[in-house]
Regions:
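N-terminal charge/polar-biased segments
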Residues: 2-6, 10-13, 17, 258-278
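Mid-to-C-terminal catalytic subdomains of enzymes
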Residues: 151-264, 271, 278
């Protein structure tokens, strides 16, 4: 417990110092209804209140988002954000991919499925458009209110390349040193310490919700990764750097290979853009 509290305080202190050093006037956050954005809202509220700057939250629905995501986002946003609103960019998305929408729902040629694409690859491509539309909205707010966009990625997602380039990333990443299982531990710690019933309800909602990318690609993160749980994923990822966990490959077999391949194949995203030295 003390270790978790120490990491929470360290994150808040570093965010606070960054805001002060760079004279930031506001923080903008996309509130998805998921665990990571919810935990960020909770941690950042304390910092923003102390510095007297707004935490501006937006839930942005696009076509495939589920009602439970919207409900969880509303609970978090109303409890922790200075300003919170729910937007629907479904029509913006449809205007992008369809010819003559709303009169016609024929896909524009560049957004149709190619002969060489699998169904999953095609869904990822369209999902990336949704992520980038959301980020257009959030970065517009950041310029309007002279703020920073919060990146809700955690260490697990970074190592798996589980984000959209020029999409669902941001300027400041509070959870960048926490594996997904660590984020769950932080959320449970915050739940246990919280006295307000409305806030406890909000925290429980983000802990219990099925983790998804919010892009309608698959029904869960686990389905997309081909594994059973984040405990499994994080143990595999940690084994890449810790020799004492060398038996993990035998323990998880096919799941290990899937995580390893995803880690290797997403290296380009962690080193983007590739800079030519001359």
């Amino acid at each position: 417990m003390k270790h978790i509290e120490f990491r929470i305080n360290l994150i808040k202190e570093k965010v606070k110092n960054y805001i002060i050093d760079n004279k930031i006037n506001s923080l903008i956050i996309g509130v998805s209804g998921g665990l990571d954005s919810g935990v960020n809202c909770i941690l950042l509220k304390n910092v923003c209140d102390e510095l007297n700057i707004p935490l501006i939250g937006r839930y942005i629905h696009i076509e495939t988002n589920k009602e439970e995501e919207a409900n969880a986002a509303k609970l978090i946003g109303n409890n922790y954000c200075t300003s919170f609103d729910m937007k629907d960019l479904t029509n913006d998305y449809f205007f992008t991919i369809y010819d003559d929408y709303p009169n016609n729902t024929q896909l524009k040629t560049e957004y149709s499925k190619s002969e060489t694409e699998s169904e999953l690859q095609y869904k990822i491509r369209l999902g990336n458009i949704k992520a980038r539309l959301r980020m257009i909205h959030l970065y517009n707010l950041s310029q309007k209110y002279k703020g920073l966009v919060i990146d809700n990625d955690n260490l697990t997602e970074q190592l798996l390349g589980f984000w959209t380039l020029h999409g669902d990333v941001g300027d400041l990443t509070p959870l960048s040193s926490l594996y997904k299982t660590d984020v769950y531990n932080v959320a449970n710690f915050l739940f246990d310490k919280e006295e307000s019933e409305s806030k406890k309800t909000a925290i429980k909602a983000i802990i219990d919700i099925t983790p998804t990318d919010g892009l309608g690609i698959t029904n869960s993160d686990f389905e997309q990764f081909g594994v059973k749980s984040y405990n499994e994923i994080d143990e595999i990822l940690k084994s890449f750097k810790e020799p004492s966990l060398s038996n993990i490959r035998d323990k998880y077999g096919d799941s290990f290979e899937k995580v390893l391949n995803r880690y290797i194949n997403s290296e380009y995203k962690r080193n983007n853009p590739f800079r030519i030295k001359s």
